């Protein structure tokens, strides 16, 4: 099994979701199934069908999270010593050379990505273009919307 890079915060978020699913969601759906069963005929019982479908989703998500956590390589960006090189977990201040606008991104795992929060997936075109670059370098990003160039202004390990 290959390892999946994830930040410390990302691992904590997955553990919190797993805990919630196991302690709140799973028992609630078991109760919903029991209540629906008590209504009698299961062949045309929409509440039962919905609860069983929800149970399948919850169990599938639990297995998915457990699998991800088992394969996770937790990386604490604050503990990185990459000598100014852009690596997974780094926070990067960039200047969009087309618009002149500054932008800041942190490179995170696929499950953690949230563009509105400035967190980009390690597998995104921009992250792939940035990995290995240093402050002052220019990265050319080839994306579906066309090519964009970014100058690396600062690399931080927060």
UniProtKB/Swiss-Prot annotation:
Please provide an example of a Pfam family that matches this protein in its UniProt record: GreA_GreB_N
Which UniProt keywords are listed? Answer: DNA-binding, Transcription, Transcription regulation
MF terms in GO: DNA binding; RNA polymerase binding
* SUPFAM superfamilies, sorted: FKBP-like, GreA transcript cleavage protein, N-terminal domain
Signal sequence span is: none
Checking InterPro entries in the record gives:
GreA/GreB_C_sf, TF_GreA/GreB_CS, Tscrpt_elong_fac_GreA, Tscrpt_elong_fac_GreA/B, Tscrpt_elong_fac_GreA/B_C, Tscrpt_elong_fac_GreA/B_fam, Tscrpt_elong_fac_GreA/B_N, Tscrpt_elong_fac_GreA/B_N_sf
Gene Ontology BP annotations: DNA-templated transcription elongation; regulation of DNA-templated transcription elongation
| Purpose | Necessary for efficient RNA polymerase transcription elongation past template-encoded arresting sites. The arresting sites in DNA have the property of trapping a certain fraction of elongating RNA polymerases that pass through, resulting in locked ternary complexes. Cleavage of the nascent transcript by cleavage factors such as GreA or GreB allows the resumption of elongation from the new 3'terminus. GreA releases sequences of 2 to 3 nucleotides.
State the family it belongs to: Belongs to the GreA/GreB family.
Specify the protein name: Transcription elongation factor GreA
């Amino acid at each position: 099994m290959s390892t999946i890079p994830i930040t410390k915060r990302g691992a904590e978020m997955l553990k919190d979701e797993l805990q919630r699913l196991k302690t709140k969601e799973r028992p609630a759906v078991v109760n919903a199934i029991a209540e629906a069963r008590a209504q009698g005929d299961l062949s045309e019982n929409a509440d039962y069908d919905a609860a069983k479908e929800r149970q399948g989703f919850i169990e599938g998500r639990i297995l998915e999270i457990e699998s991800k956590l088992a394969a996770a390589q937790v990386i604490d960006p604050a503990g990185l010593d990459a000598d100014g090189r852009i690596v997974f977990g780094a926070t990067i201040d960039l200047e969009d050379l087309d618009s002149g606008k500054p932008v800041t991104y942190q490179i995170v795992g696929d499950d953690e990505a949230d563009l509105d929060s400035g967190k980009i997936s390690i597998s995104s075109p921009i992250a792939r273009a940035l990995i290995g670059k240093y402050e002052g370098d220019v990265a050319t990003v080839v994306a579906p919307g066309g090519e964009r160039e970014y100058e690396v202004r600062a690399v931080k390990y927060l």
